Amino acid sequence: MLVTLKTLQQQTFKIDIDPDETVRALKEKIESEKGKDAFPVAGQKLIYAGKILNDDTALKEYKIDEKNFVVVMVTKPKAVTTPAPATTQQSNSAATTTVSSSTAPAVTQAPAPAPASAPTPTPVSVTPAPTTASSEPAPASAAKQEKPAERPVETPVATTPTSTDSTSGDSSRSNLFEDATSALVTGQSYENMVTEIMSMGYEREQVIAALRASFNNPDRAVEYLLMGIPGDRESQAVVDPPPAASTGAPQSSVAAAAATTTATTTTTSSGGHPLEFLRNQPQFQQMRQIIQQNPSLLPALLQQIGRENPQLLQQISQHQEHFIQMLNEPVQEAGGQGGGGGGGSGGIAEAGGGHMNYIQVTPQEKEAIERLKALGFPEGLVIQAYFACEKNENLAANFLLQQNFDED
């Protein structure tokens, strides 16, 4: 039989297999044809008619229609990108060169013309007085040749890796952000994803609820549809709607607070989950409110965290499921936290949960918010986008224009 397979990224391909074969045999065939890196057997989940196919069951038991398709979900292994070993190797190599040069005998010979001839095992021996072993004069003479060229050799060693470290650091940081946000869909791709998941046999309301609970992660949404949404987050949203505008400024302070809690991350990782320290951060509580109301702001938040604290973004990328679970937890009421002094700068108030929440803004910030509101967007969304984009008016305008407000 010819099985049509489709990924959540709209990639379609076909596999010819005997219907008497098991589901695991189909997974192995997918891995052999599409590559072990992209489709590992251990990370594959095959879904047909809203059910996950069991590895030990024969394909014919599921009565797969060749006109329909089987959904392939792939859980990618965590990519560990740590440039630290490279720097330690560099420091070790630098240490060995300095040690070898320091242990070299202080024999003043004429400098060798080519510094690249240092590793030559048979140098020109000018006065090799004690030739006890053929291996010992070679390091000594090599060290003598390294002596005059010590500075020129160390200079590229010191400069070249630093430039590559900076570029690799930037690329690894961008890779972390891409890894953390690659599974998120927004805008038109969101609507396409809703239609795609509905074709698996689910109602639109179910699909939208699952996507909202998974913060627009299609892989997680399908799991929620199959296994059930943990904690029934939809009912939480009805019973306890989070305040809208009380969480604008904390968007930027979340990453700042995370930067100050890097030491906490390392200490808690030994005793518990690496992300558990976020529960005690009031900034995370506020960030959870704004993300639960508007999940599409999550990519902007992750991008900001990636700039200010790449280590935290790496932890989030490696523990996405736990991070989303923490975001889905009900928001605790912050009693009397939103008050404060009302100094000369303006304030913006919005009703949320039966009480007023105030954000202190400068006159310039208030003017920027008013200009964004003049574009036709609701005040609550304008405030969220403005602070989520670090008070960058142009970025906030572009962000608002890309959103699909009909869904909200």
Swiss-Prot record:
Region entry Disordered, spans = 80-176, 236-274
Residues with Phosphoserine modification: 174, 199
UniProt domain UBA: residue ranges: 188-228, 363-403
Kindly give the InterPro entries that the UniProt entry links to this protein: Rad23, RAD23A/B_UBA1, STI1_HS-bd, UBA, UBA-like_sf, Ubiquitin-like_dom, Ubiquitin-like_domsf, XPC-bd
Q: Where in the cell is it found?
A: Nucleus; Cytoplasm
| Boundaries of every Ubiquitin-like domain copy | 1-79
Looking at the record, the residues that make up the STI1 domain are 273-316
Pfam families under this entry? UBA, ubiquitin, XPC-binding
Query: Key word Nucleotide-binding present in the record?
Result: no
Q: Which PROSITE patterns match?
A: UBA, UBIQUITIN_2
**What residue spans carry the Pro residues bias annotation?**
112-122
Q: Where is the composition biased (Basic and acidic residues)?
A: 144-153
Tell me the superkingdom of the source.
Answer: Eukaryota
Q: Which family does it belong to?
A: Belongs to the RAD23 family.
Q: Indicate the quaternary assembly.
A: Component of the XPC complex composed of XPC, RAD23B and CETN2. Interacts with NGLY1 and PSMC1. Interacts with ATXN3. Interacts with PSMD4 and PSMC5. Interacts with AMFR. Interacts with VCP; the interaction is indirect and mediated by NGLY1.
> What name does this protein carry?
UV excision repair protein RAD23 homolog B
